[in-house]
Amino acid sequence: MVPEDVTTQWAQAFWDAGYQLHAHTNGDGSAARLIKLIKTLQANTPKPDHRLSLEHFAYTTEDQNRQLKELGAVVSANPYYHFILSDIYSEQWLGADRGNQMVRLGSLERLGVPFAFHSDSPMAPLEPLTLVSAAVNRVTINGNLTGEHERVSLDAGLRAITINAAWVMGYEDEIGSIRAGKKADFTILEADPYKVSPKRIKDIKIWGTVFEGTPAPLSAN
């Protein structure tokens, strides 16, 4: 582990040089350390739109989420980890109170903290709709509904793999939504996510993609 003072020194150097910072945080201990770091960076060199992001976001407290909102932080989360790990973490390692509350995305949505999803491949599958399904349903691999109040709306889930994902990386003017002047890069689904059962979101088939305006149907491969 890098000593805290060294981390702060490096972070301050990149912060002052204009880089966007991304930090891996899996527990509330690392989240607390990152919150402290953001406060230091903002005190030394205030930035209204820094978009410092927490990557993974496995476990935080409600109070920490409120602090992230106040500090202007953003989140790149992996809700798949709740799907695959919540049960075993609850039973064997963290206890039900923490295991059930993994990846508190509902809290972020209520607070208005911007968030996106990532796969963390090869640790988890490259399946954006699986991430949406995990966040919207919060049903574990064993079929248990845990942390129901941390579910997110379908709209928030879809934004997390499109425009919000682009925004977190600073590419919202190029990709992430269909608009004149942006790159025509998007995926075409065979069913409307808003018209299927939430439990079926992960099963929606992919027709193909459009890359820079050129359609590429999967059937052609």
Identify the residue ranges that each predicted region occupies.
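Ligand-binding beta-strand-loop-alpha-helix segment within the catalytic cores
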Residues: 74
